[in-house]
Structures are given as C-alpha cells and as structure tokens.
Amino acid sequence: MIGNPPYLGYSRQDEDQKEDMKIVFSRINNYKKLDYIACWFYKATEYIENKNAKYAFVTTNSITQGEQVALLWPLILNKGQEIDFAHQSFKWTNNAKGNAGVAVVIIGIRNIDSSDKFLYNQNLKQSVKNISPYLTNTSNVYVSPRTNPLS
C-alpha cells in the first residue's frame, strides 16, 4: 500500500477531520496533538498486521520530530512492525499555484523480519541495522515531554 495522504497539523484540522481522528484513535489516549496523517499510519498498521504486506507514505517530517514521535510510533512499533526503509527529510515542491514547498520524508513499514533495512538521504543509500522513528540508524528510543525537571 502506498500513498500521499493530506498533511494537516492538529491545529489546522477542521471538525470532520477531528472526528476522523476521534474514530481512528477511539481506544487511544493522547492522540489530539497528532498530525492528521497519523490516521493513515495507524490504519495501515492495523491492515498489515500479521500479513505478508507493507505500506509506505510520503509525509511531512513532523511525525519524525518532537512530541509526534512519542505519541505515534509506539502505536506502530509495538504491533510487531518496523521501519523497512526511509528517506530522510527533503523539500517537496510541485507545480500547484501558491506552492510554498514542504519538508517531507518517505517511510516504509513492514512486519518485523530479518531482511535489510535502508536509510536514504539525497544520493546516499545506507544499509542499517535499525531505523528509529527519528529516521536515524539507532535503536527505538522516544523523547517525551516532562512537567518536572530530572533533578
């Protein structure tokens, strides 16, 4: 499954889109700050679970940064899935009127297996052991906000 779902941050969603989010994440707390595209990732994750299938989306890079990572990625990676390949952030432009361009990433997801994973950046293709939700060659660690200092 491949696609280029709509990019809408939580503050730019209309009432219908907020209702979509509520339906998709009905069993999940803390979803309201997720970008709209998180719906596609979550539904695709459910769709390929325990199947011989993969999915990939072009998405804004926001789901690989900040609060989005700790909110979205455990929902995917804790279902026995992993990032199969990823193209790190690059500027996407098209011929649309008023197109300002946006920083995007391309992320492919699969059920966990032992085959190679690839990380792309411009003209570089790197075979890696793991691709983290931050699209780096590291383990899956999540940085979450805190209300109290560490010490």
Predicted segments with their positions:
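Signature of N6-adenine DNA methyltransferases within the class I
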Residues: M1-S151
